[in-house]
Swiss-Prot record:
Keywords: ATP-binding, Coiled coil, Membrane, Mitochondrion, Motor protein, Nucleotide-binding, Transport. PROSITE patterns: KINESIN_MOTOR_1 (PS00411), KINESIN_MOTOR_2 (PS50067). It is a peripheral membrane protein. It is found in: Mitochondrion membrane. Residues 873-902 form a coiled coil. The gene is Kif28. This is Kinesin-like protein KIF28. ATP binds at G114, Q115, T116, G117, S118, G119, K120, S121. Residues 460-523 form the FHA domain. One of its GO terms (biological process) is mitochondrion organization. GO terms for molecular function: ATP binding; microtubule binding; microtubule motor activity. Gene3D superfamilies: 2.60.200.20, Kinesin motor domain.
Length: 1028
């Protein structure tokens, strides 16, 4: 009887869990961007609240709020209406499913994924009385074993390993194999770890002590190798075998529970622009896991997949059966609800969504046993013969255990080891109650408090040397680093020589008295909480003194806080999420920079690294703050060479530095080729600061001449810029006061010429620090596609530049005038170093006038490369002018209609003149008749003359419009020559034709207005005397 022939197809089950705010997030005033409704989880973009993304998963757990502690410290819902999900809820859904699969003979795998600090370890291991999935699964397994019938013999084997930098460390072995344990492959078994220690267990207490022992070894290894646990994967494996004594059948199940490394490492290591971005192996496992999941998801969607990259990393080799193979797999994605973690949380959700599509093919693992093999020794050794290949599960048991003895012997050996550990643990607990001691504090909460160093009466030395009372390996720890003295009920600490000791965030140089719960950092980043004498202790909550507390205290002591970064405006309690994220980055990178500096010192690389906040005091051309980001300034000691690394690039280099440093510790060899050295980069230009020159005077045709400070990223003066901007004629003659305009709209549609003249740069600190350096300046204006740079100037603290550039806006738009009124010209100062290439710009995308001046306000032009678009883009603007002229023509037609009305009135008056009073006719009948006839003739003649004049004016105007329309049609039909050499003359010709057309339109309209005004005036002059 073998495996079930028909495997069961199961999708990977995906659960998501949202944790409460961390203390750091609370201090920063973070906002929650996640919501859950009916199994759906939504995340809102803090920069655009209308952008909401919704995901659906198998299980969702809201653990963010709505909870309280019971009398045992267990977190429970605060009221019946609370949707809070505690550890017991997670175990009920996930843990019991794992146990059910194990009892039925299926392999089961649990993966915890998420960024560092998102709550992965809390869900897997738990904290205090809030036990996580791993201890609950193990405890429930043994509780169920105790209830089983007599004819079943269960066997439980336990192992615990860590994967860091593609090396496997056995966390249950006190000896470290050089280069780590090896992964082997067998055609029947698949991948397995050769030499991994498997410990037989007969109760949960043994597993609990093994986890504690493994955590202690992991913490010690992390300190010795300077390898943060957040960058390693921890895998706990349980081999559970059920031997049915009455049916000669064995069921076997592998339970793998994996706490993956922080997922943010995967994204950060892909530093854009870093020549060594593919060099680090620290992140290879997590990247490969993502590639495997993506390939399997594509396969499940019916896409053609040629290869599943299981072999790309150690982790994916060991998880091959868990992903797409023989296992029932659950992935729990841990999420931070804070707005400052939005990008990482969204990335985790997308990762989990892909994993949901992966399908496994789980089978029940069974193996037949001969009746003669029911004895314990035959159980482990009975398949050495030819039948072993037919029953790989049993053969695996032989490989792992056969050479170690029978099951009973293995249990006895494990029992003796456990008793020794229990005795040592009991002794340690006694000392904790009576002696002051140091508790380690780690970035991983599960490793905090694992190490305890006791301070006995008298002097107690700390350092690398084995002769010290406290032997501490770690970055920046000297052989004799510091001394703790326990005397007369007081404990003091004093650093040796120049060794680094920090107490409560402040470096100390002399003997310092310690108080209960003081925070101590030895070397680069070995953090400890001092626990005083029993009389000093109370019912304190030590959990609040976590890794974040240490780093925030350290940052505050160095003058870095939310307020110094400008996160909160005066009188405004709402913090900017993007700036809060910068503060979080700064605090996270602080210990990494300290460690990198220490590695540089020990490896004799001669580099000094310091954190900076880019754009801390910088603003854009309108005066608004630019987006801030953390960067690392790297300086070479002696030569004063400088590099600026982005956050992502620094993190990537830090990984590579750790690999080189680890090799140095193992072999004392730190040699590496220059191109592969993470401490080296080719020289490059360095941004020193920016100066703002406000352009408002230019909008009024006024010259401005200023001396403006270049401010660096810290807001301090780097140099002073002397610049002059002068409005001028197309020929370059400066305008005088008589050309000044009060209203900038007077310049609308007109040509504006001006010159920028950079005179000199004064007091350049960059050049004061090293006389061999040089500088360049660069600036752009309005819609200019490229930045213009001055020529390089070397070895002068007050360099004269004397560079002038002539700009022209051929028809100033409203937007350009608004730009001049409200914006500044930003001039950037760049530092040059010997051996680096100066900055330059291509002139291909710059449009020039016929005089050779640089054109701005050219939004209607696409580029010289596509000159055919120039005319077509200009056409709508010309049609707008024609439309305006037609409207004015319609107005003149209204005037014409009014004049015709007056004409009718005059004719009526003439008729009335024929019916004058009879008395007047009798007195002088002949004279009256002649006078009336003469007046009528004059009125008619004047009317005819006015109509004729108006008709002629309109005729002339419409003739002009006909010419204008003809020119417009020619412009539309005209196409540029294919010869590139003829492009510039063609553009000039087109510009001249447009100018001629504009002049024609304006002159035609002006003449029409003048003619009509003259006609109206003459009509009024004649009508007024005739009406009197």
């Amino acid at each position: 009887m073998g495996r079930v022939p028909v495997p069961r197809s199961d999708s990977v089950r995906v659960a998501v869990r949202v944790r409460p705010f961390s203390q750091r997030e609370k201090n920063s005033g973070s906002q929650c961007v996640i919501s859950m409704h009916s199994g759906n989880i939504s995340i809102r973009d803090p920069k655009n609240e209308e952008r909401v993304k919704t995901f659906t998963f198998d299980l969702t757990y809201w653990s963010h709020d709505g909870f309280q502690k019971d009398e045992d410290g267990v977190l429970i819902p605060s009221d019946p209406a609370s949707k809070f999900a505690g550890q017991s809820d997670v175990f009920h859904d996930i843990g019991r499913g794992i146990l059910d699969s194990a009892w039925r003979g299926y392999n089961a795998t649990l993966l915890a994924y998420g960024q560092t600090g998102s709550g992965k370890s809390y869900s897997m291991i738990g904290f205090g009385t809030n036990k996580g999935l791993i201890p609950r699964v193990c405890e429930e397994l043994f509780q169920a074993i105790e209830k089983q019938k007599e004819n079943l013999e269960p066997q439980v084997m336990f192992s615990m390993l860590e994967i860091y930098n593609e090396q496997i460390r056995d966390l249950l072995s006190r000896t470290k194999a050089p280069g780590g344990l090896r992964v082997r492959e067998d055609q029947q078994l698949g991948f397995f770890v050769e030499g991994l220690k498997w410990v037989p267990c007969e109760n949960y207490a043994q597993i609990e002590k093994l986890v504690e022992q493994g955590s202690k070894i992991r913490m010690t290894a992390s300190t010795n190798m300077n390898a943060s646990s957040s960058r390693s994967h921890m895998l706990i494996a349980i081999q559970f075998k059920q031997v049915f004594l009455d049916t000669a059948l064995t069921k076997r199940s592998s339970i793998n529970m994996v706490d993956l490394a922080g997922s943010e490492r995967q994204r950060s290591s892909g530093s854009e622009g870093d020549r060594l971005r593919e060099g680090s192996r620290v992140n290879l496992s997590l990247t490969s896991l993502g590639n495997v999941i993506s390939a399997l998801a594509d396969l499940a969607m019916g896409k053609k997949v040629l290869h599943i990259p299981y072999r790309d990393s150690v982790l994916t080799k060991l998880l091959q059966s868990a992903l797409g193979g023989n296992s029932r797999t659950t992935l729990i994605a841990a999420l931070s609800p804070a707005d400052i973690c939005y990008e990482e949380t969204l990335s985790t959700l997308r990762y989990a969504e892909r994993a949901k599509k992966v399908r496994n093919r789980a089978v029940i693992n069974t193996c037949p046993l001969a009746r003669a093999s029911r004895a314990e020794n035959a159980l482990l050794l009975g398949f050495r013969g030819a039948g072993a290949a037919e029953h790989p599960a049993c053969f695996w048991a032989e490989q792992q255990l056969g050479n170690q003895g029978t099951w009973a012997q293995l249990l006895e050996q494990a029992r003796r080891e456990w008793e020794e550990q229990y005795e040592a643990l009991t002794q340690e607990q006694k000392m904790v109650r009576i002696l002051p001691h140091l508790l380690n504090v780690n970035e991983d909460p599960q490793l905090t408090g694992v190490l305890k160093f006791f301070i006995h009466n008298g002097s107690c030395d700390v350092g690398r040397a084995a002769s010290n009372a406290i032997c501490l390996q770690g970055l920046g720890i000297s052989d004799k680093h510091a001394s703790f003295v326990n005397l007369d009920g007081k404990v003091t600490v004093a650093p040796h020589s120049k060794c680094k000791v920090i107490v409560n965030g402040v470096p100390v140089t002399g003997r310092t008295k310690l108080q209960h719960l003081d925070r101590i950092i030895l070397g680069s980043n070995s953090a400890f909480l001092y626990v005083g004498f029993p009389s000093e202790r109370g019912a304190e909550d030590l959990s609040r003194f976590d890794y974040d507390f240490f780093q925030l205290e350290r940052a505050a002591a160095e003058g870095v806080s939310v307020a110094t970064l400008g996160c909160v405006s005066p009188g405004d309690d709402q913090a900017d999420p993007s700036i809060l994220a910068v503060f979080q980055d700064y605090v996270k990178l602080m210990p990494l920079v300290v460690e990198a500096n220490q590695m540089s010192e020990e490896l004799k690389k001669g580099l000094t690294m310091e954190l900076k906040v880019k754009n801390l005091a910088s603003s854009d051309s309108r005066g608004y703050d630019l987006q801030k980001e953390v960067m690392v300034k790297v300086t070479k000691q002696g030569t004063h060479e400088v590099w600026i690394w982005s956050k992502a690039k620094f993190i990537n280099r830090k990984f590579l530095m750790e690999e080189l440093y680890q090799r140095f510790l193992e072999s004392r060899d730190s040699h590496v080729a220059q191109e592969d050295d993470p401490f080296w980069d080719p020289l490059e230009v360095v941004h020193l600061g920016s100066a703002h020159v406000w352009l408002q005077p230019l909008a009024h045709c006024m010259m401005l001449e200023e001396q403006v400070e270049f401010l660096n990223c810290d807001g301090l003066e780097e140099a002073v810029l002397h610049i002059r901007i002068t409005p001028c004629s197309p020929e370059g003659w400066a305008h005088g006061e008589e050309d000044m305009v009060i209203d900038p709209l007077e310049l609308l549609g007109k040509r504006i010429d001006f010159q920028t003249h950079i005179v000199r740069c004064l007091g350049v600190k960059w050049l004061k620090e090293d006389g061999s350096r040089g500088i360049q300046m660069g600036y752009g204006i309005y819609d200019l596609p490229n930045t213009l740079y001055t020529k390089p100037v070397w070895k002068s603290v007050n360099p004269r530049i004397e560079e002038t550039v002539h700009f022209a806006a051929l028809g100033a738009s409203r937007e350009f005038l608004d730009y001049l009124l409200t914006n500044a010209l930003i001039v950037d100062l760049w530092g040059l170093q010997e051996g680096c290439a100066p900055l330059g710009v291509s002139q291909l995308d710059v449009l020039l006038t016929g005089e050779g001046h640089i054109m701005v306000d050219t939004k209607t032009f696409s580029s010289v490369k596509d000159v055919s678009q120039i005319t077509s883009n200009q056409v709508p603007e010309l049609y707008q002018k024609l439309l305006k002229l037609e409207q004015e023509t319609e107005l003149l037609r209204d005037v014409n209609r009014a004049l015709r009305g007056e004409n009718v009135f005059l004719k009526a008056s003439l008729e009335n003149a024929g019916s004058a009073p009879q008395a007047q006719k009798l007195d002088n009948p002949e004279g009256a008749t002649r006078t009336a006839a003469r007046e009528a003739k004059q009125v008619c003649a004047q009317q005819a003359s006015s109509d004729a004049q108006l008709a002629r004016a309109l005729k002339v105007f419409y003739q002009g419009m006909g010419v204008a329309r003809g020119q417009l049609l020619r412009l539309r039909r005209c196409r540029p020559p294919e010869d590139d050499q003829m492009l510039r003359p063609f553009v000039h010709q087109q510009s001249q034709m447009l100018k001629d057309l504009e002049d024609l339109l304006e002159s035609s309209l002006h003449k029409l207005k003048a003619d009509v005004a003259f006609i109206v005036k003459k009509r009024k002059e004649y009508l007024l005397p005739s009406q009197q």
